[in-house]
From Swiss-Prot:
Keywords: Mitochondrion, Repeat, Transit peptide. This is Pentatricopeptide repeat-containing protein At2g13420, mitochondrial. Pfam families: PPR, PPR_2. It comes from Arabidopsis thaliana. Residues 1-19 form a transit peptide. The lineage of its organism: Eukaryota, Viridiplantae, Streptophyta, Embryophyta, Tracheophyta. Belongs to the PPR family. P subfamily. It comes from the Eukaryota. It is found in: Mitochondrion. InterPro entries: Pentatricopeptide_rpt, TPR-like_helical_dom_sf. One of its GO terms (cellular component) is mitochondrion. Its main location: mitochondrion. PANTHER family: PENTATRICOPEPTIDE REPEAT-CONTAINING PROTEIN, PPR_LONG DOMAIN-CONTAINING PROTEIN. PPR repeats lie at residues 172-202, 206-240, 241-285, 286-320, 321-355, 356-390, 391-425, 426-460.
DNA sequence: CTAGGGTTAG
């Protein structure tokens, strides 16, 4: 892979062939294990990226390497190209052009998702019409990407039109629930309720659908509406279950303001009320219920209350999960009680739960607050040495830490690690980096990453754009600005008011 | 994609 990287764009087949045979012979002498499909995919996608789509070489180089394009390998390659929509599409078209086309429904759905992320809906529609590989999932993916792009009306229309493409396989309640859930997750709860009311006769309704809508109102901090829907649900004869109540509980606890002590106490009472109501209906609160409350105590930095509550739940015979422990660890870290947090890590391990990157991120967050570069680097090294795989969020906190400290060399080092990691940079990574570079007045570099993030399908925040724009104009970098402007026109991106509405993707687990 | 909890954020 490294050897392939070194071949720069005007390259020749014999060059590529020589490199590949070097790799193969190196493999023999070093006795490397046989390539797995995933590392083959790594090789292919790397080849595609660094050599700017050498499709005319692909077949011969694949043959040389003894690789055959299995459906799984195609899928893996597309996965690795998911942030490079243009190359991914070229690869996909290449697959279609082969004598025996090797696209599968799975790879088809993946390319639809990749294109949807960069809002290439015209291409998506064209592919759906041209190819006969459309499954119900294809439409659900399209629906999700349309909603993510703020095109909710089109999303509902795509949902309605789907049966025409699916030999009249009708969507049922599950798919309807997905539509509503996606609308809610991206903040379009009102629209979801509208759609629900229009079609509840057709699709029916169950506790899941109501839970989705209640969660939607909670997301908008409309607890009053959430409670109204709970009442409506019970009135229409649908029994809420533990998930429904947990959603409501989370709505109350998550966004609850904790500042003046009275408000915090009022929220605690509200949460207790939900617990009481649950028990009245014969539903026992579960680990999730307790974790939600623990999280609220943790946000309020109530270390003692958090620890007591955890004891209480253990006494009730409910075993904490990794989420529960992480909440408590977060609380201890944010109270500066790092030693106790470390002790809790040991307790976790003893009870058979190994900390995740999310757990360790609490420590990184505290190091960031303390501007403790050594603490952060030590833990980071331990993680790299096999303690636990850092997540994108881990990298993001680290980036923030060293940007704040002005240590741009370390930032570069972490960025390279992040680039090489499995998941790669996300919207937040790019945002931090671009803002960091802007604060150092490295406008051209910032601009480069800004363009890169767009190419990878991340929609920058309006603030990021404005910061960069002001910097470029003030420092008279008109040529860079014009290049950027051209890019934005090409991708038809404008930073109007509508862009403030969906700066983030909903969190996925 | 498949109703819910932990990490992140100028």
């Amino acid at each position: 892979m490294l050897l392939l990287k070194q071949i720069s764009p005007p390259f020749h087949l014999h060059q590529l062939r020589r490199r590949i045979s070097t790799i193969i012979s190196a493999g023999f002498t070093l006795n490397l294990p046989k390539l797995e499909p995933s590392s083959d995919a790594e090789l292919i996608s790397q080849m595609l990226i660094t050599n700017h789509n050498p499709f005319h070489f692909m077949e011969s180089s694949l043959q040389l390497n003894g690789i055959s394009l299995t459906p799984n390998l195609i899928h893996q390659t597309l996965l690795r190209l998911r942030h490079n929509s243009k190359i991914a599409l070229s690869f996909f078209q290449y697959l279609r052009s082969l004598p025996s086309p090797s696209t599968t429904p799975t790879s088809f759905n993946l390319i639809i998702d990749i294109l949807g992320r960069v809002r290439q809906f015209d291409v998506v529609r064209q592919l759906i019409v041209e190819m006969d590989q459309t499954s119900p999932e294809t439409f659900l993916i399209l629906v999700k990407r349309l909603i993510a792009a703020g095109l909710t009306r089109q999303a509902v229309r795509a949902f309605d039109d789907a049966p025409c493409f699916l030999e009249n396989r009708r969507f049922r309640l599950v798919e309807f629930g997905f539509l509503l859930d996606t609308l809610c997750k991206y903040g379009y709860t009102k629209m979801a309720v509208g759609v629900f009311n229009e079609r509840k006769e057709e699709f029916g309704s169950d506790e899941k659908v109501y839970t989705i809508l209640i969660a939607g109102w909670c997301k908008l901090r409309r607890i009053d509406m959430a409670e109204k829907f709970l009442v409506e649900m019970i009135e229409s004869g649908i029994e809420p279950n533990v998930v429904t109540y947990n959603v409501l509980l989370n709505g109350i606890c998550r966004t609850a303001s904790l500042h003046p002590e009275e408000r915090f106490e009022r929220n605690v009472r509200n949460a207790e009320k939900v617990f009481d109501e649950m028990r009245q209906r014969g539903i026992e609160p579960d680990v999730t219920s307790f974790s939600i409350v623990l999280h609220m105590y943790s946000r309020a930095h109530k270390a003692e209350l958090t620890l007591d509550k955890m004891k209480l739940m253990k006494a009730k015979g409910i075993s904490p999960t990794i989420e529960t422990y992480t909440s408590v660890v977060k609380c201890l870290c944010s109270c500066g009680r790092l030693e106790e947090a470390e002790e809790l890590l040991e307790t976790m391990v003893e009870s058979g739960i190994s900390p995740s990157s999310a757990t360790y991120n609490c420590f990184f967050k505290e190091y960031k607050g303390r501007k403790d570069a050594n603490g952060a680097m030590n833990l980071y090294r331990k993680m790299k040495n096999g303690l636990c795989k850092p997540s994108t969020q881990t990298y993001n906190v680290l980036l923030g830490t060293f940007i704040n400290l002005g240590k741009m060399e370390t930032v570069k080092e972490i960025w390279d690690d992040l680039k090489a990691s499995e998941t790669g940079p996300d919207l937040d990574s790019y945002t931090s980096l671009v803002h960091g570079l802007c604060s150092k007045e490295k406008w051209k570099e910032a601009c480069g990453y800004f363009v890169e993030m767009i190419e990878r399908g991340f929609l920058p925040q309006k603030l990021t754009f404005e910061t960069l724009y002001k910097g470029l104009i003030q420092s008279n970098k008109m040529r860079t600005w014009r290049r950027l402007k051209k890019k934005l026109d090409e991708e038809s991106i404008t930073f109007g008011s509508e862009f403030q509405r969906y700066p983030f993707e909903p969190y996925k687990r």
